[in-house]
Amino acid sequence: MIKIKRKNFIKFIIIALIIIFAAIHLNKLVQNYNIFSLFYEVGDSIDSLNGVNVYYNGKVSNVIGRNVSKDGYNIGQKYQCVEFVKRYYYEYYKHKMPNSYGHAKDFYDIKLSDGQMNKDRNLLQYENPSIVAPKAGDLLVYGGTLVNPYGHVSIVAEVRDGEIEIIQQNPGAFRKTRRVFKVEKQNGKWKIKNDRIIGWLRKG
């Protein structure tokens, strides 16, 4: 009788651990993935920041033409991540980048020191970590990966105590447009806790 009870207890523990494990991973899925994207079509407006829309692009590699402003400024390929950040800066800040081309990771100039002017983008450039904390409106630049060698860009939508919320276009077919990253001050510098983020750009 005692052996049966022990076996049942062990089974109960195993089941409980499985439930806890599933709940943790389900929470991560809910935080990072958007099941409603099953119903989106490419070009649907799915989010916005200060009146500037984020459009659904489906798979990361998808392109449906180039967005060029009425005055001839190259905004980018629809609806890549670069297209959104450039359109945001163009519409909200009335800002045109002197160099309007390049992949996402090319927005960051590795030759510059923290706080120097990035002349290609006509924006101040800060490295991650930086002596200057990120703020709303900053353009985050992410390095490339084996899956995505071109990098990624997003906009800081909001700064809260110890964290930032970003908004992005073309994160992937089922990824959310918003993400939250922790921000910590380490040795006098502000660090966004995401190893892919190499730095950020800011309108001076």
What are these regions (language model features)?
Residues 2-21, 25:
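N-terminal Sec-pathway targeting helices
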Residues 10, 28-36, 146-204:
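Aromatic- and glycine-rich peptidoglycan recognition patches
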Residues 24-112:
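N-terminal capping segments
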Residues 80-87, 135, 155, 196:
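Extracytoplasmic/secreted proteins, especially bacterial periplasmic and envelope-associated proteins
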Residues 105-170:
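...with weaker cross-activation on analogous glycine-rich loops/strands in unrelated enzymes
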